[in-house]
Amino acid sequence: MNEIICYGKSVEQYHVEKDGSRLVVRLGTFDRAAHVEWLQKHPHKRPKPQASRTHVSHFYGAGSICDKTGQPRETEVKLKCVTGQSLSSVSLYLLEPHTCQYILGVESPVICSLLPLLDEHGLVPADAQILPEKSADEEIVINEIKDEL
């Protein structure tokens, strides 16, 4: 199994069959209104104040219907700042704490520079400059990681 996250759009899981075809299961789709509603229902998931913020969670709902529950799949995407590693390092993990309800963790030093830009919902405001003053090398790495997300 492999997971693909297109940040701000969708999370998908795919299986490559023996014939080379891919079976794609959508684990969730991002919708700002659904994310804000999810934060209201789960206040402990709201971003901490900027001074103490080390991670944020985003809600991706309305995924493929789960065969076992009959409900749409959903995923919490946890973006976590980690330090002491190469700027280009990224760690990913996928958990399924409940049937067809997932947690996709994304941990990277790049996230550290994004956290101060986020609003009270943990989202990047439309007018925010995504890349604060960084060297050209850092900007390339950030863009590559954003493309992977």
Regions found by a protein language model. Name each.
Residues 1-149:
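Long, low-complexity, largely intrinsically disordered segments
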